[in-house]
């Protein structure tokens, strides 16, 4: 009887130990899962904060505009000299991606000729996260405190990268293959070589399903397709049928879109929401 009792007690203790061990494993897995979820939430916040805003990097000159459609635009300088000469700004177009806590920025084309885009933020930054900031600026009569967080990471050489938020871009672009920033009908004045003294009204209507209706009054009227990726649009019939063209693009305040050459970064054309404005 005593043997049976001891045997039963032993089996019970072993069962309890197994349950406790299982509980410890479950608790450990739950803790890891919770930690991973928090990390993913923080990285989602970084991405949401980054896209749609203009940024400066450390103490370097120029601004980096990160768009929701994954285009990145760099701008610096420009203006007029005291003598009235135009100083052309440095401009570059590229794309950005986030993979975990790594932010990659790559520039593909810049202007003017001779502007070295390799000197820009053109690499992968690791360990990207948000960091509190209290930047104080002011004068004798007023003080301003910028409490917006920094985006901080590590360059490939081990140095720290600090990105400070500037202006909002009023960005309505998105990551889809048919970017909402292009959708709708846009108008432009078109010159044709066989009628150099006449300006024709052209229109492009971009639809959500990836089709685009191209019209040049009295000259062209056809439907084609388009796709968008990383701030570039490929139109499988631009101005004339079967002429495939790819551009960087910007939607400015919903009133116009600008198309930029992927070869040299210069503006190719402007298309306006208001048809009457094409003659201004």
Model-predicted regions and their roles:
Residues 1, 32-33:
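Terminal processing/anchoring signals of secreted or surface-associated proteins
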Residues 1-10:
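N-terminal secretory signal peptides that target proteins for export/translocation
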Residues 10, 14, 18-26:
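Hydrophobic helical h-region of N-terminal Sec-dependent signal peptides
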